[in-house]
Regions:
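Conserved anion/nucleotide-ligand pocket segment
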Residues: 50-107, 111
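Short glycine-rich anion-binding loops that position phosphate/pyrophosphate groups of nucleotides
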Residues: 11-14, 130, 159-160, 195
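A short helix->loop->beta-strand "cap" motif at the edges of active sites that frequently abuts
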Residues: 26-30, 49-50, 151-152, 184-187
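Active-site-proximal cofactor/substrate-binding loop regions of enzyme domains
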Residues: 4-18, 23
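Internal helical hairpin/lid segments
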Residues: 117-174
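ATP/nucleoside-binding phosphotransfer catalytic cores, i.e., glycine-rich phosphate-binding loops
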Residues: 158, 162-208
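Conserved small/polar residues in nucleotide/adenosyl-binding loops
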Residues: 1-5, 209-211
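Short, acidic/small-residue loops that bind anionic groups at enzyme active sites
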Residues: 23-43, 51-57
Length: 211
């Protein structure tokens, strides 16, 4: 009998990357979480296992709207949820492995052995509480690593609180940073997806999707 993992994370925060210093015996099944859980989702995906779901935590699931809870149920039971709606910039359509992540956590995984294959992938990013200049710094790091240039498509979820508490270091807006750092990639880009640190955090399967 094959014992399958069915892991739903209670909360995010910090520290999940420390677990990657150990050899995690991933098994088939599914893993649910987001934010700091990006580290575990990516490690599992790099190990060649499907079933990762970037979605609500146990501590936030009860506050999710009905459509979000139903979407998660559909994914857990092998049903196909409806397509998400965002704001496309430019045109085009692409198909590739779907990867979702918190931008800050994923940025600190670059260069490690826990980064899934990015070539041709569709990457969905979200974050919370990071000033636009920090978002710019991280996306520039991705570009310097050649990571953004490998993608087949990119989607931006919610960057909650990332345009608040503006200070003297702010010389641009979040919107301008996201546009400028992806403008020359010549791939489909979608913004304002209902994904991230919001009530209405749409679950995403780490699988195939069109944008």
């Amino acid at each position: 009998m094959c014992i399958r993992d069915r892991l739903a994370c209670a909360r995010g925060g910090w520290g999940s990357a420390r677990l990657l210093e150990r050899s995690i015996p991933w098994k088939p099944g599914w893993l649910l979480g987001f934010s700091d859980i990006t580290s575990l989702l990516w490690s599992r995906l790099k190990a060649g296992l499907a079933g990762g779901i970037h979605g609500p935590l146990l501590t936030t699931l009860g506050a999710e709207p009905a459509w979000s809870q139903e979407r998660l149920r559909q994914l857990l039971f092998g049903e196909t949820p409806p397509a998400l709606k965002g704001e496309p910039r430019g045109g085009g359509q692409t198909t590739g492995p779907l990867i979702a992540a918190n931008l800050t956590v994923a940025s600190h995984l670059l260069g490690s052995d826990h980064v899934p294959e990015l070539q041709g992938a569709i990457l969905i990013l979200e974050d919370v509480g990071e000033a636009p200049y920090r978002i710019d710094r991280m996306l520039t790091h991705w570009r310097l690593c050649g990571a953004l240039q490998q993608l087949g498509g990119i989607g931006f979820g919610q960057f909650e609180g990332c345009d608040r508490n503006l200070d003297d270091l702010l010389t641009t807006t979040l919107e301008a940073v996201l546009d400028e750092r992806t403008a020359d990639l010549n791939i489909p880009v979608v913004k304002n997806l209902p994904v991230g640190h919001i009530c209405g955090n749409a679950a995403l399967p780490l699988s195939l999707i069109h944008i």
